């Protein structure tokens, strides 16, 4: 197969990401982390104190100050923090880095739609276990042989949050597999 045909085949299998509805009227979309309120006075004060150069020059590529602040807040080591250009960037890197086995990765059938896009783009086989009748993840479906697991917590778009014991059960049954819990909306 020629490189051109190979590329065309890869492009054909990738479904483009379709963002959520973009209403024209003035609507605050909570599902995309929009906020109806202005920044807190403390946040506004920080922005007001920034120098012009801090906005127009490329930021610190190591994100040192941010990593330190996050590590302090989360009470973890700085080496346990990874910073990217938004959660989509971080997740894309996770797919490329961790999901490279011939075994299929697992993610729910109703979930963040970009997981399927990345899996197709990076040619990662996947299986999507169905949610139960109450739109919850069935943890036992994630106990089988797999090439890794990813799911959001809370799940998108169901907004159902799974407690630590649920996640620990999945981890116990996947000691030799990568399990990624996507918490992009955990504070939402």
Regions found by a protein language model. Give the residues of each.
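Conserved core of the PLP fold type I
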Residues: 55-175, 180, 185-188
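N-terminal "arm"/small-domain region of PLP-dependent enzymes with the aminotransferase-like
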Residues: 1-57, 145
């Amino acid at each position: 197969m020629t490189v051109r045909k190979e590329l065309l085949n890869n492009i054909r299998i990738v479904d483009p990401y379709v963002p959520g509805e973009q209403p024209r009227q003035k609507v605050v979309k909570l599902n995309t982390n929009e906020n109806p309120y202005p920044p807190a006075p403390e946040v506004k004060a920080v922005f007001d104190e920034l120098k012009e150069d801090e906005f127009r020059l490329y930021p610190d590529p190591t994100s040192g100050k941010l990593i330190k602040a996050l590590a302090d807040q989360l009470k973890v080591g700085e080496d346990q923090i990874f910073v990217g250009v938004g959660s989509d960037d971080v997740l894309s890197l996770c797919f490329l880095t961790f999901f490279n086995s011939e075994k299929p990765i697992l993610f729910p059938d109703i979930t963040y739609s970009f997981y399927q896009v990345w899996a197709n783009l990076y040619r990662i086989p996947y299986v999507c276990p169905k949610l139960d009748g109450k739109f919850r993840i069935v943890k036992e479906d994630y106990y089988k042989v797999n090439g890794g697991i990813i799911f959001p917590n809370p799940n998108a778009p169901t907004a159902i949050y799974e407690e630590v014991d649920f996640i620990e059960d999945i981890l116990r049954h996947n000691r030799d597999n990568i399990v990624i819990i996507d918490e992009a909306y955990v504070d939402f």
